[in-house]
């Protein structure tokens, strides 16, 4: 039972990191586009 959670934990961590990176990238793009349009 100790062997199965290890790959699952790694997959969850990879999914979380990719999700956070995607949100950060979207936020940066939103700030850039908002500043571009408002200026």
From Swiss-Prot:
Residue spans crossing the bilayer: 18-38
Annotated InterPro entries: PSII_PsbL, PSII_PsbL_sf
UniProt subcellular location: Cellular thylakoid membrane
Principal location listed in the UniProt entry: membrane
Domain of life, per lineage: Bacteria
Membrane topology designation: Single-pass membrane protein
Function: One of the components of the core complex of photosystem II (PSII). PSII is a light-driven water:plastoquinone oxidoreductase that uses light energy to abstract electrons from H(2)O, generating O(2) and a proton gradient subsequently used for ATP formation. It consists of a core antenna complex that captures photons, and an electron transfer chain that converts photonic excitation into a charge separation. This subunit is found at the monomer-monomer interface and is required for correct PSII assembly and/or dimerization.
Subunit structure: PSII is composed of 1 copy each of membrane proteins PsbA, PsbB, PsbC, PsbD, PsbE, PsbF, PsbH, PsbI, PsbJ, PsbK, PsbL, PsbM, PsbT, PsbX, PsbY, PsbZ, Psb30/Ycf12, peripheral proteins PsbO, CyanoQ (PsbQ), PsbU, PsbV and a large number of cofactors. It forms dimeric complexes.
Record-given protein name: Photosystem II reaction center protein L
Organism for this UniProt entry: Microcystis aeruginosa (strain NIES-843 / IAM M-2473)
């Amino acid at each position: 039972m100790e062997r199965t959670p290890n790959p699952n934990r790694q997959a969850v961590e990879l999914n979380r990191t990719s999700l956070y990176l995607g949100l950060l990238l979207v936020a940066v793009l939103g700030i850039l586009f908002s500043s571009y349009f408002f200026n």
